[in-house]
């Protein structure tokens, strides 16, 4: 069990540019419970309030949402990724995405109450979470820039495809 926890620690250490002191990281890991998720199983479900935190230890998860009647994939989570819903964590509103296992997977689950207590008790953990969240937001924005192009590319595309807008 200790080697599995060390593996989680190493994954989390590699996910963020801000290095959390070992004692605080071990405290965070100590709050988690290991859960196995079968292929197709979910840890966070659209339409439900779930503010808890999940760390992928093994496997791959997709973040899916419904667009009308079509299910669309927004992103993927690999080992070391932290999965949480901003809707549920921040606003206590129902989740927009379903976080679904693409294969048999393992996550470590931290209840929001324990997570929030650690943020309140540890300035270093709060800094680490801020950095971690900023990193996630950076990569979501980076993904969108690659899919949609940057502002000059989008402007040129609009000129080409919708010149009437500029008349």
Language-model-derived ranges and their functions:
Residues 4, 52, 151:
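Hydrophobic (often cysteine-bearing) scaffold residues that line and stabilize catalytic clefts
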Residues 16, 41-102:
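Cyclic nucleotide-binding regulatory domains
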Residues 17, 33, 37, 82, ...:
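Generic structural signal for secondary-structure transition and capping sites
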């Amino acid at each position: 069990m200790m080697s599995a926890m060390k593996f989680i620690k190493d994954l989390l250490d590699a996910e963020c540019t801000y290095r959390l002191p070992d004692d605080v990281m071990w405290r965070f890991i100590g709050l988690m419970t290991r859960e196995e998720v079968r292929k197709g199983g979910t840890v966070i479900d659209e339409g439900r309030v779930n503010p808890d935190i999940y760390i992928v230890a093994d496997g791959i998860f997709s973040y899916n949402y419904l667009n009308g009647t079509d299910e669309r994939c927004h992103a993927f989570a690999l080992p070391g990724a932290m999965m949480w819903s901003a809707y549920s964590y921040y606003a206590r509103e129902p989740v927009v995405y379903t976080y679904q296992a693409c294969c048999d997977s393992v996550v470590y689950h931290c209840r929001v109450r324990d997570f929030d207590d650690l943020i309140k008790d540890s300035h270093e953990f709060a800094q680490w979470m801020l950095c971690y969240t900023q990193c996630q937001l950076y990569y979501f924005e980076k993904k969108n820039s690659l899919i949609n192009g940057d502002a000059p590319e989008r402007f040129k595309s609009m000129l080409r495809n919708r010149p009437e807008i500029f008349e």
